[in-house]
C-alpha cells in the first residue's frame, strides 16, 4: 500500500524490537484495522517528509520503545511526541507531514539559508507587531526529563533486569534556574541522549 515509502516499514524488528516514531505514526495513520487508515488515504500523507523524519530519528538513535495501549487523538499525540523527537507534525498543502524541526543535511544540523529580512521597515504599515516576553518569562529554567532504562542483554545478572526510571536534569550553564519543568518520556524513551536532546 505504501510502496513508495522506503523507511523501515513494514515493521521488521531486527534491532531488538526497536522502532522509530515516524514509522509507528505512519502505521497508525494508514492502518485501517487499528489506526486511521479508513479515514486517511495515502495521497493525504507526505511520504518524503516521513522518510526524512525516519532518517533523522535513525541517525540520532531516537527510538520509540513503547506501546500505544489506549485510544488517542492521533493529531494531538503526533504533535506532542514529534516535539520530543525534535520533529514537527503538520498539515501542509492538504497532506500530513512529519519533518525534522531543525535544518538538517544527512545526519547533522545545517545553517538555514536566509531568504529575506522582515522588519518594520519593509512590511505594510500596521501589519507588523512586536511583542516582547516579560522578564519573568525569559528566566532560565531547568528541565527534568524522565526516561526508562532497560537491560541491553539477556544476562539476568546485569543491571536493569526490570525497567528503571532515570532522570536527567538539563539547564543552561552559568545560570541558576528559578523553575524546574518536568518532561515524562518513560512511555517510549530508553536512550539518555534522546531524553537530554528533547
Locate predicted features:
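C-terminal extracytoplasmic interaction modules
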Residues: 5-198
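Secretory-pathway-linked proteins and extracytosolic
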Residues: 1
Amino acid at each position: 500500500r505504501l510502496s513508495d515509502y522506503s523507511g523501515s516499514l513494514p515493521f521488521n524488528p531486527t534491532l531488538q524490537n526497536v522502532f522509530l516514531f515516524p514509522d509507528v505514526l505512519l502505521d497508525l495513520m494508514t492502518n485501517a484495522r487499528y489506526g486511521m487508515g479508513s479515514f486517511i488515504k495515502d495521497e493525504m500523507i507526505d511520504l518524503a517528509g516521513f522518510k526524512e523524519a525516519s532518517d533523522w530519528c535513525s541517525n540520532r538513535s531516537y527510538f520509540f520503545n513503547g506501546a500505544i495501549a489506549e485510544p488517542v487523538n492521533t493529531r494531538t499525540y503526533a504533535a506532542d511526541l514529534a516535539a520530543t523527537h525534535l520533529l514537527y507534525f503538520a498539515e501542509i498543502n492538504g497532506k500530513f507531514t512529519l519533518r525534522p524541526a531543525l535544518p538538517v543535511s544527512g545526519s547533522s544540523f545545517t545553517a538555514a539559508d536566509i531568504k529575506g529580512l522582515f522588519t518594520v521597515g519593509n512590511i505594510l504599515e500596521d501589519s507588523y507587531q512586536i511583542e516582547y516576553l516579560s522578564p519573568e518569562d525569559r528566566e532560565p529554567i531547568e528541565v527534568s526529563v524522565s526516561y526508562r532504562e532497560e537491560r541491553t542483554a539477556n544476562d539476568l545478572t546485569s543491571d536493569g533486569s526490570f525497567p528503571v526510571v532515570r532522570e536527567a536534569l538539563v539547564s543552561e550553564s552559568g545560570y541558576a534556574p528559578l523553575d524546574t519543568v518536568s518532561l515524562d518520556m518513560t512511555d517510549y524513551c530508553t536512550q539518555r541522549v534522546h531524553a537530554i536532546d528533547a
